[in-house]
């Protein structure tokens, strides 16, 4: 949600800012803007509602400079308008600010300090830049001291990048509970919400921790706390490749990322299994879980759905009870914990604000934790006790695909490793390397049937406004994820239900032509019951689509998926549903990668 990019010391600041904003599009936004300045060029501020392409269209040839900041906004305070778009300026125009996060006490700050100020928009960010200007222009503080004073008063989550038009080649940066990263170059330095926006310019990065302030010039990066104490900070090299963030010949990133899933499975085998089939999982993680009397999995959105599959495997292979919690609810109401809990946080980005809120509480209690994420160096990765990386490569499409399947596969390695360490027979007999290799083959088989799936979508989901996924056991978990994918990118109102709950209310919503998509994996008894539920909906006019594992398939089933181990069926069974969502969106002429109102990384609570 929202993206920040800034550069100082570059001869082509405008180009770098625009390319950076384009790389941040995946985070979700509704407006964008840049401010560019330089010692020998006039300052220029340009903002636009809509796509980055709209902003680029407003840029003139005179928008150039050696320093600047840019922003993609996802509206939280105020509608998507040019007045509410960032960067925001002080009344005099001297100070320019971009911000990601939520200032919780902006009303109080406005009432106490800025009652006589006039504001152009309705954002909390505009309050912040006016506050900085007040302390600098009315109290005579330096820009740095004015910024520090404002930061001491602001409550909430934020990532700030500030410029003073009177000092053209300095950027002031601060963060709290919102991601921000420094990029290091030769004769220039950068700041950005994540590394992908800077990877064309640098592979050398520096982390910023919460409640730290950074002063950037073209030759220096000074990190300090809010009291002004200078801090030492090591840089690191990011392992990102430009080819990872391109679409290649694909029309949308989502289809590319769906196709990458067999490779993700095989890469995870190489990462977490030795050649003899033994597990390569950190022994400290294994020991931490062995010492626990209960595992708590905390996640949101798609990662929450992946958590269901992880719960099933961990309980079965380790004989340890597992609870799954929604991060957004646990942040407000953490339940009574067991005597020796172990926490697992699932997050594609590693920046999910709700999950971090829970992790902060977990750390305050001194409890062990593991983050399973796709982004090394992310906030959740840094702040948890341990990290396991999915290694799926950048996921650009807002709708998560390969991160979901990668999370389940990664946690399969963890579950097997812990189970083996505990002497569990099931874990020893579970040949994960072989079974995950079969999953990769199953995915490839499904991907070879794209045209058939596209035709099914064109036949049954062309104009529908409502649809339902149903399933039992692990198929129910997949149904929830499948319904989320369909609704978020096709805008079809879709819900995923436990098939056995249909008669408890949901069946009243079935009418003639309502698509009901049933997931049926390889268990004869469960399959029979789910088929019975399908017939109940058909009797009431539903149009049924069955997605079935081959071991329980019939001639009239719609899509048949290769049979895999029950622990891993959530991976293979979800692939057809990802393609269904993709084609439903594409056939409606929608932007598959950037659905309306959604953000890739949810960095505000």
UniProtKB/Swiss-Prot annotation:
Example GO BP: fructose 6-phosphate metabolic process
Pfam families: GATase_6, SIS
GO molecular function term, any single one: carbohydrate derivative binding
Residue ranges of domain SIS in the record: 285-424, 457-595
Active site: 2 (nucleophile), 600 (for fru-6p isomerization activity)
SUPFAM superfamilies the UniProt entry points to: N-terminal nucleophile aminohydrolases (Ntn hydrolases), SIS domain
Entries under NCBIfam families matching the protein: glmS, PRK00331.1
Subunit structure, interactors included: Homodimer.
Function recorded in the entry: Catalyzes the first step in hexosamine metabolism, converting fructose-6P into glucosamine-6P using glutamine as a nitrogen source.
Record's protein name: Glutamine--fructose-6-phosphate aminotransferase [isomerizing]
Gene: glmS
